[in-house]
Amino acid sequence: MKKLIVTVLTSVFLAGCSTYQKNADIPIIDTHIHLYDTTRPEGLPWPPKDDEVLYRPVLTEHFDKVSDENGINATVIVEASKWIPDNQWVLDLVKHDPNRYIGLVGSLEIGTPDFKKHLTKLSKDGRFVGIRMRERPGGDSFFENEAVWSDLQLLSDRNQTLDVLMFQYSLDDVDMISKRLPKLKILINHVAGADIEGKPADPKWIAAVQKAAKNSNVNCKISGLFQQSHRQPSPRNLSFYQSELDVLWEAFGEDRLIYGSNWPVTMRGGTYGEYLAVVKGFFADKSRAAREKFFFKNALKFYGLPALKH
């Protein structure tokens, strides 16, 4: 009996190792991390002070360690602060290591008089690749503001990118934007806002994903899996997330899925290594070409970034 248990455990261990070894020589770009400093004299708008997990300094030295431990070659930072100067603050913070910190998805309020001015200024730095829509001023009337569409058109004209957080926006919003601006590069964050419960995916969500994915300019990040789980602490087994991941794979295919973590928010659900293991597990049976696209090539193409430097 003891020998049987040892054999089973060894098999499980080797299976896990084989997944990592299969990806060991494939570079990884994490397209979704946040950096901030809670000790700044001016403070910061996010995370809130009562967040026991996130309210602490999260700086390059912290991600460097995570990155080195997990084989992450480079990263794209997503600005979570709504304060405009914080875009430049992050660019300055990471300028010492341009090979690791290769891009910034900024935070600028679309539909405001100074949007173009701020976008133009920040874009002088080639690492500033685009912006993320996070908050929705005006609520349901947001898209009735023609200035919103002018700013989105500007992004498209400049070949810059639009990340969309599925919090105050919907997949129907993404579908509408992509149809009106078919050349705008759009990236849906956090597994398209899936509510993951470890059972077959919600049919309404599936239909919305399929509708949005019909637009060739729409892409999706496999990010924030642990945060989208209704069960906490987040399950570490791939089977819990399988249904939603299968839907996204079928809808977007190997050319329009991109890897991201949502670190340090991932720490609410587990370690970075545990998160990465789930994602790698899903792609373990995919072709090498598909894994290369997902883990780094699609990110370079979408964000318009230069080839990785080793």
Residue ranges, per PLM feature:
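Active-site glycine-centered loops adjacent to acidic/histidine catalytic or metal-binding residues
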Residues: 262
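C-terminal motif of bacterial Sec signal peptides marking the signal peptidase cleavage site
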Residues: 15-16
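Catalytic pocket-lining loop regions of alpha/beta-barrel enzymes
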Residues: 142-258, 309
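Histidine-centered divalent metal-coordination motifs
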Residues: 32-36, 190
